[in-house]
């Protein structure tokens, strides 16, 4: 069965291909900010926000590709009682990083698989990240050096790049930080016979 990733994320695609999966990636265009805002207004948890967005992406692509196994993914940042997506500008990222420094936040990464137009599997992983006390100047320099590469990342950092220097502690699965809880996904695909085990 053909595997489709309902995402434009180069990181997710690279992780899946590095794991030996053959797949194609097609972005599923949904109004993420509008959906996130509506869910927050209803009091949805960060996990529910990530799961709903992942499902909407998978569903949208599955409607056009019923023959494929479609993987929808989403990641949100949870800080106190707020749910954050991607910062829309360097200024917004600066404000986020200033609020996060010295604090602990969570990244929640959700996956939903659709088969024959219906959801068949879902998983959400959570990681706790504690940001160190960074100076305003270091944060400004970090954003100036990295904006173009982190602008599409929740939190505005890549743990696999200079963004790792923002943190004093990370508790949880590395793949979940990257937006793809890979091991549970591979386990499911193996159990179902989609990949050899």
Swiss-Prot record:
Gene3D superfamilies: 3.90.950.10. It comes from the Bacteria. One of its GO terms (molecular function) is nucleoside triphosphate diphosphatase activity. It catalyses: a ribonucleoside 5'-triphosphate + H2O = a ribonucleoside 5'-phosphate + diphosphate + H(+); a 2'-deoxyribonucleoside 5'-triphosphate + H2O = a 2'-deoxyribonucleoside 5'-phosphate + diphosphate + H(+). Its cofactor is a divalent metal cation. It is an enzyme of class 3 (hydrolase). Nucleoside triphosphate pyrophosphatase. May have a dual role in cell division arrest and in preventing the incorporation of modified nucleotides into cellular nucleic acids. This is Nucleoside triphosphate pyrophosphatase.
